[in-house]
Amino acid sequence: MKKTVLRAYARLIAEVGVRVQKGQDVVIEAELDQPEFVTMVADACYHAGARKVTVTWKHQALEKLAIRRESVRTLQTVADWERAKLQHYVDTLPCRIYLLSEDPDGLRGVSPTKMASARQGRYSVIKPYRDQMEGRYQWCIAAVPGAAWAKKVFPHETKSRAVEKLWEAILHTCRVHDDPIAAWDAHNADLQARCDYLNSLGIETLEYRASNGTHLTVGMIPEAQFCGGGEYTIGGSYFNPNLPTEECFISPKRGEAEGIVYSSKPLSYQGQLIEDFSIRFEHGRAVEAHARTNEALLQKLIAMDEGSAYLGECALVPYDSPINQTGILFYNTLFDENACCHLALGMGFIDTIRDYPNRTLEEMRALGVNDSMIHEDFMIGTPDLAITAHCRDGRTVPVFRDGTWAF
């Protein structure tokens, strides 16, 4: 891949993704196999005005080894230096860039119970720091092709060709062409126009139906609004948290989901794939879940904490989105969630609540924004998915028909 194109992508992440402000610190989290591109992103952040760029390196093989060899108690421990680092982030609010390149099957064979216990133990310590940063800093998730991931997506290609093809797909879906920044300005404007229309309807519930058996009704929070593309921090900094993105999303009301929904794509979770699954909801809670593969892992996900069995997001993405048109199954939620409509179990987004900077976290939880240590998207969009809005004034308005926008 030409370095000029990769530099344009790095600039997009720095200037459109996190939109680094002059004098701001940046923290990049990436796998060890991406030093060249991480350097490009760091350089782009400095050019955008960053004061300091720090890189946190990860290595999936070491993560797997630690889960296998360390005790649950050790895995749960948050050391004093980690707490100090979290407090430093609370105090300085750096931009956070997450570059994904992991192998979708990289944690296959490790105990989901042990992983869940470790995460639960750490979360109780980390949550107060996370809550203090909620809505106050820019962050962006983007992707870089790791070799194992590329071979999973393109199994019949050589390793080098698979990586090249995955690069091409990532850059295409992220609109990295002649003028990517202008392209993203136009894309954000289109998503905002769709959100404005949806917000004008006064939606009380969304009803999902598809021929695969999906029939689910989800309640909306009256104070909530659809968001899409870029968003603002409480301090007014505009950023794009996901590159790419094709969604208009909202946080539904906790406790108001009834029916059953069937997945339309595999879910990559903790380095393993959950395939062909369904979840049934009663009074908002997931009460039954089945899967062809990794059913136990799905059930562990749902049981992670009190909020993990409830919905935190409803996202509308047309089945003919540019990502779905590639015909590629990415085995990565960042891309597959933007191929079609999806829901998310777990944490809701406080910034979908109107006037959220002037509300407390407790007030937003009381309105019905779900809280959880997890936020896991799963894809439900199909070519015949119909979504109908039942509005507070009694109107019934088609939102999706035949898998795509009805307006």
Residue ranges and their predicted role:
Residues M1-E258, A389, R395, W405-F407:
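Active-site bordering "gate/hinge" segments
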Residues R11, N199-L201, Q270-Q272, G307, ...:
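Short solvent-exposed loop/turn micro-motifs enriched in small/polar/acidic residues
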Residues I250-E306:
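Long, well-ordered mid-to-C-terminal structural blocks that present hydrophobic/aromatic surfaces
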Residues E256-E258, I274-D276, H283, A309-E313, ...:
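Active-site lining segments that contact anionic ligands and/or coordinate catalytic metals
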Residues A286-P357:
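Dual-mode signal for accessory low-complexity, basic/Gly-rich regions
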Residues E362-F407:
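Extended hydrophobic packing segments that form well-structured cores
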